[in-house]
Amino acid sequence: IRYLVRSRGLGDVYKRQNTNRFLANLSAEYKITDAISAKVTGGYDKSDAKTIALFSPEVAGINRVSGNGQGTYGTFDQTNKLFEATLSYNKQFENSKIDVVAGYSYQEFAREGINAGGIGFGPDMGLAASQLEDQYDLIANTISGSFQNFAYDQDRDYVNRIDFGAPFDSAFVSEPIGTSYSQLFTAYFANTFDNTDELQSYFARVNYTLADKYLFTGTFRADGSSTFGPENQYGYFPSGAFAWQIHEEDFIGDNVSTLKLRLGAGVVGNQEGLGYANFIRRTRFSDIGITDNLTVTNSGTQFVGNNNEALQWESTLDVNIGVDFGFNNDRFNGSFNLYRKETTDLLLLSTLAAPQVPGIETIFQNLTDGKVVNQGVELALNYDFVQTEDFTFSSSFNVAYNHNEVLDTDRIIDTGPINGNGLTGAFAQRLQAGYPLFSFYMAEFTGFDENGNPTYVDVDGNGEGDPDADKKFVGEDAQPDWTAGLSLNATYKNFDFAAYFNGQFGFSVYNATDNAFFNAGGITIAKNVTTDVLTSGEAPGSSVAVSTRFLEKGDFVRLQTLSVGYNVPMSGEGLFDSLLSLIHISEPTRPY
């Protein structure tokens, strides 16, 4: 449970969040013969979250809240289910062995919840918090059958429901709630949602080992997802790999403990980020809210999503070659990899020039006439520097380089929307062949003139730099060229120490916060700005167009994890053989 209290008085703003989670996994295996076995696995993951946030009626200067306490109540329940069945065959021969697995998997991801709100309560924040939840239960229990949302104010109440068995023109029903209930607020609304996604897979894998030296692997997957239309729900993804354990050969010296050559090629599918049923236009009631007049809004029907039944799986062909090596019983070991990945049918959220549905200006599409290529190299090294009875010290280092480029498409897609005052329709990136994905495309900022107005590079040659007409690729993108990591591990008697550093280099970040808020224009409307704005020479009424003015280097090195521990020896055969005292510091997020 997390509580957040802030503002000028301890009771002015109140927030409570409570999350519960239950996980369970069960498996059963049956050996049919010495070589054949069957296994069934089930998984259940249930979480429910509840959030209540309140503004006291004593808060001043916030629209419609002053004198009228306002709060929101929300729930989010998610249930993930897994069923998997496999049949395995394992056979050892005189000079080889084979391992075959075939299986079926089904996953269900169900989400449902409530977004509710009320206005018009007194200064007792604890009472108001409980009433926000109670009000929903009071009304929901009086409504017969399912519903999408309901609301009331001092003049009316209504409930909206969808009859899925009725013809379309009579399926959407809006009517009075009809039964008596206690009204705990001046106005109250509740919107509900309920959706389910499914993933079904058939798969097979064959591993064959010859003479403990040569390893062959082949796999095949057929994955079906409800996030795509009926004609494109399934994607088919084969892969194969070969490995040669060279250290098993007679011509390799004893000091070489590991030497393996690896070759692999395979196709991997992706459907992440699509959301629920974005391949088809649907109709539902719009969400209800509260107006500044303390009345609830009307809720008519609206379209959701855009028709795109051609939406399909994104696929990535990964071809790689690598070497694993180790010396002196792997005291020094590592790996080296070269790879090339070609992504086709890239899934992207693009802006529609002529929206199918008013107000819905974006659509998920596949980049069907092009591909995105990633190719690079990876190196990992590990070394045990000291190995004694009282003291050990080891280190691991990895570094990788990646080159990214969009190829073979004639499309030009503007991405990276930037929001804020004066930034309607603004964007910071463009997808175009010959450039990396997420390349920044904008005017190049050169400073301020004598009047404090921003100046830009003149690209079109008309003698004047214009932030809209003189956009260009500025040679920066949002993907790092280099990534690296370093871990240090040591023990001294009962003490242990671990540290992990990581870094990313060769990429840029657009500071949309500075663009929207921290400029001289904020001074004229009584907004806080950073101190550098006061000395920048910028005029208060100048343009805040998207430009390299707000483009920053994203390179960083950070200490991500640091831990120090001490093991306290304990005599006897109790429940614990040792007690670990641990100091642990972790930074999971980027420092910008």
Per-segment meaning from a language model:
Residues 367-374, 421-453, 520-548, 586, ...:
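C-terminal beta-signal and terminal closure region of outer-membrane beta-barrel proteins
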